[in-house]
UniProtKB/Swiss-Prot annotation:
Highest taxon in the source lineage: Eukaryota
Keywords attached to this entry: Cell membrane, Disulfide bond, Glycoprotein, GPI-anchor, Lipoprotein, Membrane, Signal
Lineage start: Eukaryota, Viridiplantae, Streptophyta, Embryophyta, Tracheophyta
Propeptide section residues: 167-192
Protein name (Swiss-Prot/TrEMBL): Early nodulin-like protein 7
Tissue: Mostly expressed in flowers, and, to a lower extent, in seeds, but barely in seedlings, stems, leaves and roots.
Disulfide bonds: 88-122
Glycan attachment positions: 48, 89, 101
Lipid-linked residues (GPI-anchor amidated serine): 166
One Pfam family linked to the record: Cu_bind_like
Length: 192
């Protein structure tokens, strides 16, 4: 009976160690290239899905050093200012691409606004706001960097963001301590 409990505890400890390694490797992730819209790509949304790009952006986290890949056919993509975004006005773009496979480097924190070069496509929902957070942080939390807001929000609480950031940065540490705690607890249980 005692041997079976020891084996079970060892298996659990091994599984938790593997979990900790996976979580730690995810925390050390470097710059990424995001294909805008995933498999949908950069095209006019379906009639009942004009928020497809808002949903896509809110399901991703963008950092300085990441890039966006726009894949499209017979269209274009423009980076515009906030006014150009909300009015689907591409008359004075910051950057414009029309080669069908365009990559845009996210080189600063803050909001980036993208629209289709076709006014009709833009008003049908082919536009995107991306919020870029600071550089990918590996293990140390830089207290000099202000917390980022969540995607597409204009007024996130800095306290909520700071606590979420600190909770996320302590996750790998917690995962590493769990197997140690279980091992110690199992030896204490076995010795009685």
């Amino acid at each position: 009976m005692m041997m079976m409990m020891m084996r079970s505890t060892c298996n659990l400890t091994l599984m938790l160690c593997i979990c900790a390694l996976v979580v730690a490797s995810m925390a050390a992730e470097g710059p990424r290239d995001f294909k805008v819209g995933d498999e949908f790509g950069w095209r006019v949304p379906l009639q009942n899905d004009s928020a497809v790009y808002s949903h896509w952006a809110s399901s991703n986290r963008f950092h300085i050093g990441d890039s966006l890949s726009f894949v499209y056919d017979k269209d274009s993509v423009m980076e515009v200012d906030k006014w150009g975004f909300y009015h689907c006005n591409g008359s004075d773009p910051i950057t414009a691409f029309d080669n069908g496979n365009s990559t845009f480097d996210l080189d600063r924190p803050g909001l980036f606004y993208f629209i289709s070069g076709s006014n009709q496509h833009c008003t049908s929902g082919q536009r995107l706001i991306v919020e870029v957070m600071h550089i990918h942080q590996h293990h140390d939390h830089d207290a000099s960097m202000p917390p980022s807001m969540s995607p597409l929000s204009n007024s996130a609480s800095p306290y909520a963001s700071a606590s979420a950031s600190s909770a996320a940065s302590s996750l790998p540490t917690a995962c590493l301590l769990i197997p140690l705690f279980l091992t110690i607890a199992s030896f204490r249980f076995i010795s009685y």
